[in-house]
Amino acid sequence: MAISILTVPCGAGGLNGSSSLTLVDIAELRQALNLSYESDSWQKEGGASKINTTVISGAPKITGLTEFKTYKVAATSDGKIVTVVTGGIGTTLKTGLGANKLSTFIETIGATTTKKLFHFNGYDPVQVWDGIAASTSAIATPPADWTSTSHPALGVSHNNRLWAFMNHRVYYSVLADHENFTGTGSGSLEIFPGEGEKIVCGISYANRLWLFKYPKGIYYVDDNNPDQTYWSIRRHNSEIGMSGPLGIALADLDVHFLSSEGRIHSLARVQEFGGITSGAIMPEKIGKWLRDTCKYSLFDKAIAVYYPYKSEIHFAVTDVSGSDNNRRLVLDLHDIETPKFRWSDRDTACSMSLFTDSNSKKKLMVGDAAGFVWELDTANKNKDSAGYNCIFETPEFSPVGLSELNPLGTGKVRVALQYLEVVFEPKGTHDLNVDVYGDGQYRYTVTFRMGESAGGAFGSFIFGTSTLGGGTISNTRRKLFGEYRRIKLKGYNNTANEDFSIFSMMLGYIAGSDRT
């Protein structure tokens, strides 16, 4: 009897958490944990290593993080601003700030037209540092109503001014003097005070200042005319908003953000005065999953950072039982026509930013809840020398009856499994385990060696390489057995410094018995 083959293309689809099976395709994944879609394959995501190998004194949460000039600058939960070096704290720039305040940083031009770093936390006076002085200083000329513990939580550099927000009002500095909010040319604007609770976020995009309110409301300021009397404020959308200041990222020519209702949106696709789902990225595939697995009440602490090296946006969020950002939902945009989601539970990211590594690449770094700053996506697939789980899991599918109406097959007849063949890039003489599920139950595990190019264990066939000792692409096959209506495959590896890169899986089968 001729063997039929069903090919599962790895890397063609991403995480799909839909509860409707009609919206799940065989190329998609029901679990994509600590996985990467590099090279349009399934790989273990890059590792993590400590930037400061000595803990910051007191082991505080890293509540804010940025790179400024040659420094890595962190705000900590014990009210400090410090530079971070291998040995922990390089310089303590400020003490005595409010405890446990989410901090934001913005680099812009100060009063002397030199680059300066501005720190906001919504509680203390805005801090300014030039990268030379031994400490930060409070902004010299704030608006009169920035007093006591009422201060902006975020600033935005836009059209050669610094802009900041409190309640329903946006403040702007003197042109080209970002420390001066009282001089000629400075001022403030009310943004639809009868709508939403307050402005929580802003970003400069497409030559406009965009403002987001909690729980709903997107607005923009058109300030392109040099005469301020001609500036205009417009409502863009009244049904979508945000929870906090950092859940937004500019990615090439678009802005992506996490809404207060747990959807990820493209600002370029949010229609003016549009409906609640306008601009949402695959809401049917990832929206419910995000809302079911993450804590709504902590969306105000969510952070989004665009990682240009791999064309990914990383959203740091908190799971339903957590108190800090302990999940990363990653939107992979390297194939802009087919965006894909994946997620990670490996790292705590109370703060997240980019930094420049020794090869001048912009890399991701996160600040945890225990006094450490970590580099992500390291070449070695370990976290501080320890292994971590990497799991891919297909939907449950039937090889028979696949169609547009039945994207996972009909399951009307049994098939007798013959083999599973994996096409992969050799990564080393270690194993990838694949659990085989039949009709909803775990049945057995098959193991694929990820580096041999010839020979193998009984029941394993390895072929397709160009030379002995390994090639760029290899195939390896394992015998399967059992008759089932529906099959699911779950692959995993959790060993330090072991990797895999799977391009496709081919399931060989023949017609099974007709017993019920």
Could you describe each region identified by the protein language model?
Residues 59, 148-149, 194-197, 242-243:
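Short loop/turn positions that demarcate and connect the beta-strands within blades
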Residues 130-156:
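Asp-box/WD-like beta-propeller blade repeats and closely related beta-sheet repeat scaffolds
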Residues 152-177:
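Carboxylate/His-rich catalytic cores and anion/metal-binding grooves
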Residues 1-117, 238-255, 260-516:
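Beta-sheet repeat architectures centered on beta-propellers
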Residues 143-145, 162, 185-194, 278-297:
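Surface-exposed loop and turn segments in beta-propeller and other repeat-based domains
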Residues 82, 127, 171, 218-219, ...:
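WD40 beta-propeller blade core
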Residues 210-237:
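Surface-exposed extracellular loop regions of Gram-negative outer-membrane beta-barrel proteins
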Residues 168-194, 228-231:
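Short, flexible helix-coil linker/hinge segments at the edges of structured domains or between repeats
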